[in-house]
């Protein structure tokens, strides 16, 4: 190889500061570097795969050709540090900070209430900030698109979008979609009338600081000089195991590729990076040709466009946008098809990192672009050192990786040529994914047809399908047989049969959904057929008939709209003192810190001297005996200090049925067997891979509820309530309907995974733990038991958690004990951060449920008798399963009075990781079954489900089935307001009209009511304590036993203290929750955090005010600070402990009666959806929510909880699907496999109203709203059910069918039975083992 001038110096800038690294390690990424080297912890680790956006940063590069600076978002977890040469990186700290200046983006995100737990907030800030650097006055659509790669589990996205829209040229935060009028304008019909004393503004735009784009930091001039330097040198960075080479010229690149033919070319690292992380791929050499000019050229000719392989997908989209606007429509059909897919392919961060060449070369089977490029006759321009430039057709053989059509190892893709389309050629791209954006396709297709000029005779036809085989496949034989045919219905019928014969998906194919994917192949083909038929009609209306009018809506995918809406809540009494903050929509106490990245989470804490990191080794078998455990290789690995097993537990390894370390037997895949402690997490993880475990399987292995029933395997005794004479009533009803509903589980997907820092103390066997938990006392209990020391020696500190939703009630106790045992054995601090995949595997989630019902009713819809059975899949240990099944049974009537009612429930023991608490605690599962049988009764009676709900709803003060008295008046009010103000009946009529005019798309509406019980039926869990200190300067330090999970609990407690002490809220500070300040605290769950802790804070403050009252009487006109000084001088204690005994709840299961709950939260939600019957996709058009909030202490926080819970519930009922193998292995272990809602799934119109009432039992007559909105998400499920029912009726099918949860596209499509579902081949279940199974 000729001598080349080289350098080993990496130069880049971070937040305006120059960074120089000599020989950086190519295996280190930017996220690690910013957090661990530069101590910039605002950028968060959440998934590690580029799928959540929490680690978003802004990358800025200078292009010497255009002489422009390009700003774009990137996920730091996928960016190798060596990739940064010549780049300027901006992290959230570089945008603004409390110490210096808070940027308007950060301020508005916080003040618009766009943060809750705050873990996703820095990523949200960076996405909006990057957009503003490119578009200082963005459109609402640009804001929505910019946030498409960021996940939030708390807020429901609406306030985040709203904060971004404040930067739009004409703010649209309170405008109807398209009308330009305020939602509250009397002429607008989104809400039919204005409420007296109702407010709609959660923040004051006048408080925002102005945004001046001219004041942003400049791009470092040194980087411009570097980019324009004509004498650039090759860069070579030699790491411990790998070498990273950055060539300067094309010849240099080709020389390197010839010398290292197996070295991957890394441009965006979106393919190579995940392969290294998850598939243990290793490459000794990486070549990164980012700066090679020839890879970044674009050239247009009369025949088409040539686009450089180095173009990012975002640049590709911009180029296509320009070409489509400049060229005649007939020439750009391929470009248009690519444009459409580029809008939803991944998220903006990945689109700005991934390149056209990398995407084309890697040829993933799920590729959205390659099928279209192939259909559009694209060719690949390939070069090599030998000078043998060649054009490789981007066709079936290339995509199927046939050797004769593949790239040679030494070749480099230079560019892609995309020809213009011919006049009589039509190209289309089609896809269907679990959600609209940032999700791999379940099936996609690129199709092209060319006709003999002026005819509908097929001259050429191409069809390529993705996600149906290990590679993208071509239906080439089908296409050959159709050449010369007319484009008509008979051709379509033959094409469907042929393509199903040619493309065979095995019944046990990876990814499952086999029958659905087979259906999608021909459903997408039919869509293409319709598109072409419509296009032919446009070409010559006289010669070619148009498609039927009822088919037109099938042509287009659902558009992505910017959400609009309004929030209504009761205004504060104008007589209330100005400094009293109770009732005001106050920003989250940590909102600004969330947005600036200065809110400290556990892994943001600085490293401690001699700190070790912990990695877990988990079982790969569901039920087996451990025959051997060999840790010798792990112990010999670099940096490893020790391996910890069950033998190292000084105390209890099995505490209350929960096992820290498996010892002789494993009872689920994912059970912890041992942990490895090392100096770095990478060393610990590498060593963990070298632990050798041998097993002998034990029978039976029980995975599903049905298998548990078969083996009589249960975790708890049966729970039962019954009223009336059920058996007698069944004999005296007009009709009986029976059925069963399967409700699958749900992953918490809190943005911050389980995180613990355990620090052994030098004296008295003390241990200090910092962790994110909902239940510090429980952690203390488990650690105490494991270490065999008194609880008083264990101190648990909890500042905040990055989301929890029930997943941090019990699990941190087990994991905390595992961590503490490791710290105890090594005598060194241990940092234990679960990776997302391990977190999802180990901690499990919501209980899957099987519900069976038998309902007796009269022909008018009145239900006289119900016999319901519930079974939950509890997993392998008790955890919270018994309590969950109790809640399921107690809450199983929802809002309905059924005089003869029997409900039974049991928690099943299976060989899955133990399921645990989750927001709603069984209510979201149980009530789906209730509403399902309501819908079944409605169908039998030929009534609307809403009519049956109204008929059977509680109407006056009554007793529940468990004999608790309650007044349903607030329920009736929410129900009535929801029906009226959502214009349900008018919109239902409009939907019917739409459905009559559209065969392949249907709209559905549903209104569901809710009676949600707050707190738990165990009295001692409802107690709380608080500690309040007043300092001599008048400032107040507040602490209590509640945990901040994002719900704003501390903010509300500050409001309470401010009112009770009659001081401004700025005087009150909350530091942390700790077992050393408030011991023996109950868990923060059950929607009761503000209730019980608020009472305790109130009590403490009242005690202090009683002490201060004599002082105040002496000096009534004095200031607070003067009173405090006087009190101190008179030796009056300025500290007080407050206590709340708790709600006195009880439940006697032997008598089947009690008063298990202090009060109920009532509500109703109306949702409207549109369903694509050909694909199973759906779009949520509008949601109206009415929740009985009584008197809201903080409407902004309460509305945030309602909206966030609703979107989380909507995800539970639609997109979120956990997939298990028949052997109990969880497949869904990250955002690429598990799809929580993104910004594109939220309602296009979203209206939330907090209905005022009274609740004298709670503090300030408030109610706990943390969980109530979760079940209301089922209004989307039942709206889908309504739409599918309409489709089935039109097709002559039964309108009673099991629409199980979640209603994924697969479930929806296969329920819409038609000629295409009937056409697909079926397999005998006894002849194969499916790839995945349902566990409910």
Swiss-Prot record:
Enzyme class label:
oxidoreductase
CDD domains reported in the protein's UniProt record: fer2
Annotated FAD binding sites? 265-272, 346, 355, 359, 368, 413
Binding, [2Fe-2S] cluster 2 = 117, 120, 152, 154
Print the keywords alphabetically: 2Fe-2S, Cytoplasm, FAD, Flavoprotein, Iron, Iron-sulfur, Metal-binding, Molybdenum, Oxidoreductase
Needed cofactors, names only, are: [2Fe-2S] cluster; FAD; Mo-molybdopterin
Is Metal-binding a UniProt keyword of this protein? yes
A cellular component annotation (GO) from this entry: cytosol
Q: Which residues form the active site?
A: 1267
Q: Which reaction does it catalyse?
A: an aldehyde + O2 + H2O = a carboxylate + H2O2 + H(+); retinal + O2 + H2O = retinoate + H2O2 + H(+); all-trans-retinal + O2 + H2O = all-trans-retinoate + H2O2 + H(+)
Q: Where does [2Fe-2S] cluster 1 bind?
A: 47, 52, 55, 77
PANTHER family attached here?
Answer: XANTHINE DEHYDROGENASE
The entry's other comment says: AOX genes evolved from a xanthine oxidoreductase ancestral precursor via a series of gene duplication and suppression/deletion events. Different animal species contain a different complement of AOX genes encoding an equivalent number of AOX isoenzymes. In mammals, the two extremes are represented by certain rodents such as mice and rats, which are endowed with 4 AOX genes, and by humans, whose genome is characterized by a single active gene.
What is the recorded name of this protein? Answer: Aldehyde oxidase 4
- Which taxonomic lineage does the organism of this UniProt entry have? Eukaryota, Metazoa, Chordata, Craniata, Vertebrata
